[in-house]
């Protein structure tokens, strides 16, 4: 008799996606992050659901409701810090996942890649709105500054900002709608993840060499299920250590001060995972120019397949491109550092130089290096 997992209409889909799925035999640990992101999303939806049961999205009570969760709800402090630090873990995995895609040429699967970019934007929007909900000082002023950027759009900008705010400033209407969207968007993310996997399973996974691996495939279970569980244990160890030993390490102390529209914090900044984009935004003196640079810093990923001029897909055998890739990583870390610093000399010029280098490496140096490497192959 045929195994039920291969015949049952529902189990068959799961079987073909996670059990009998043919996978390349040489996938490294860099291929673990997809499953880790799935776990992060599940953790965020579950902890968020329980937090939403106790949270109130009203400017008068939002801050106190978060305090109530931490002090009075059974394990409320654990839920709150798992959710806050789970977001950080989500973005760490997300950036490593994108980095893996850039390094090994996974962006050549353009449908999967484009859905991934859409996922990135959706997750960023969700995280931004979630940061507003505790209604601390940084929540309020972060929401004010970031939504205000839309006023740079010619003609409709000011009306658009007031439409999003639901008034003439960030207030009760803004908080209520942000809570509604913050609750809704993770389910959209989950739906997009399904589409992401659908397109991935149309082509099959890439592998570190970038060479087609059709002739040497192994079943996903047990080989990669075990490998994913190991990665999961490492990630959960890191997350639980962060939550239990240093839960406020990645947060901003200003967010423990209730939101006050009459008192501006000395340094308004977003969460650490947005600092690189924030640094690029600030490095351009013009408001509209800064907003465009901010959007393009992420949208540039969409043209990566067009900028791929190398005859080899992966960077595994391309040492010059590898050097540029790691330089890009260093620049992104520099931008993250600059985004958290005040707007003064020498941080301004460092941020501007790093921003120029970020775009130059992706748009100019990487394609030129690929052409040079193609030429060297002929020797």
From Swiss-Prot:
Membership in a protein family: Belongs to the cytochrome b family.
UniProt-recorded name of the protein: Cytochrome b
Compartment(s) of residence: Mitochondrion inner membrane
Binding site for heme b b562: 83, 182
Annotated binding of heme b b566, by residue: 97, 196
Keywords recorded for this protein, A-Z: Electron transport, Heme, Iron, Membrane, Metal-binding, Mitochondrion, Mitochondrion inner membrane, Respiratory chain, Transmembrane, Transmembrane helix, Transport, Ubiquinone
InterPro entries hit by this protein: Cyt_b/b6_C, Cyt_b/b6_C_sf, Cyt_b/b6_N, Cytb/b6-like_sf, Cytochrome_b, Cytochrome_b_C_euk/bac, Cytochrome_b_N_euk/bac, Di-haem_cyt_TM
Function in brief: Component of the ubiquinol-cytochrome c reductase complex (complex III or cytochrome b-c1 complex) that is part of the mitochondrial respiratory chain. The b-c1 complex mediates electron transfer from ubiquinol to cytochrome c. Contributes to the generation of a proton gradient across the mitochondrial membrane that is then used for ATP synthesis.
A molecular function (GO) term: metal ion binding
Subunit structure: The cytochrome bc1 complex contains 11 subunits: 3 respiratory subunits (MT-CYB, CYC1 and UQCRFS1), 2 core proteins (UQCRC1 and UQCRC2) and 6 low-molecular weight proteins (UQCRH/QCR6, UQCRB/QCR7, UQCRQ/QCR8, UQCR10/QCR9, UQCR11/QCR10 and a cleavage product of UQCRFS1). This cytochrome bc1 complex then forms a dimer.
Residues involved in a ubiquinone binding: 201
Cofactor names: heme b
Recorded topology in the membrane: Multi-pass membrane protein
């Amino acid at each position: 008799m045929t195994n039920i997992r291969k015949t049952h209409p529902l189990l068959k889909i799961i079987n073909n996606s996670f059990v009998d799925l043919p996978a390349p035999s040489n996938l490294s640990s860099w291929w673990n992050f997809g499953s880790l992101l799935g776990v992060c999303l599940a953790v965020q939806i579950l902890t968020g659901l329980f937090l939403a049961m106790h949270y109130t999205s009203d400017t008068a009570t939002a801050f106190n409701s978060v305090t109530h969760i931490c002090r009075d709800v059974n394990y409320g402090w654990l839920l709150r810090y798992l959710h806050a630090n789970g977001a950080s873990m989500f973005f760490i995995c997300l950036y490593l996942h994108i980095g893996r895609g850039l390094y090994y040429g996974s962006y050549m699967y353009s449908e999967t890649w484009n859905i991934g970019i859409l996922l990135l934007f959706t997750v960023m929007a969700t995280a931004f709105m979630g940061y507003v909900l505790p209604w601390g000082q940084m929540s309020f002023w972060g929401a004010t500054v970031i939504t205000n950027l839309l006023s740079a759009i010619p003609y409709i900008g000011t009306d658009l900002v007031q439409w999003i705010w639901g008034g003439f400033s960030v207030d009760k209407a803004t908080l209520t709608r942000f809570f509604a969207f913050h609750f809704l968007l993770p389910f959209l993310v989950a739906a997009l993840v399904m589409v992401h996997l659908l397109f991935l399973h149309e082509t099959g996974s890439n592998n570190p060499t970038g060479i087609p691996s059709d002739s040497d495939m192994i079943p996903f279970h047990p080989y990669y299920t075990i490998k994913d569980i190991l990665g999961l244990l490492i990630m959960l160890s890191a997350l639980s250590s962060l939550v239990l030993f240093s839960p406020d390490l990645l947060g901003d102390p200003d967010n423990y001060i209730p939101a006050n529209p009459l008192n501006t914090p000395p340094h308004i900044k977003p969460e650490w995972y947005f600092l690189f984009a924030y640094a690029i935004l600030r490095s351009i003196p013009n408001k509209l120019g800064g907003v465009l640079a901010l959007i393009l810093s992420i949208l540039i990923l969409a043209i990566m397949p067009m900028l791929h001029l190398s005859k080899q897909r992966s960077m595994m055998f391309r040492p010059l491109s590898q050097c540029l890739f790691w330089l890009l990583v260093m620049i992104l870390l520099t931008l993250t550092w600059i985004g958290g610093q005040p707007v003064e000399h020498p941080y301004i010029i460092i941020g501007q130089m790093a921003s120029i280098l970020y775009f130059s490496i992706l748009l100019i140096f990487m394609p030129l290096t690929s052409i040079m490497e193609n030429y060297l192959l002929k020797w």
